[in-house]
């Protein structure tokens, strides 16, 4: 039985890094938090069953002097949208280890004879030109290798989302009227947002 499954584990000979991660909430997504790596276990994690704007499955180890345009940074980005864990740990000799993978808080997977288990991918990026170069590398990697479909390199359809127009005060007729008006304006896609509450 598997009770811990990490996608990446890196070790550094010193702890002279800051841990950077992104946190947030509704209407204030992707806030940057930068804290020194310390002699303790530090983690960025989600146990909500999904990754989200609360805690993104992404972290950076940045040298103390690293900024947007200079300095060494190591990015860890999990391609995973469930319970995740990215943790740092420093031992008595100042050796730093960082692990990234499935959150083991309630993880247990029984493997039968001959079966295998694949952990989520963790995309690691190194830059000696700061956070900006790391970000641009991730953007290129994801646009070329993760984005799929016919719209990968084309403009996507213009859409109208029903939420701001009617919130939860909707009827079938209101939604049809919105969709008809949107079509007359050339809007190509109508998103029924929160219509699953029922009418």
What are these regions (language model features)?
Residues 4-6, 121, 193-194:
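Glycine-rich, histidine-containing beta strand-loop boundary motifs that form or position
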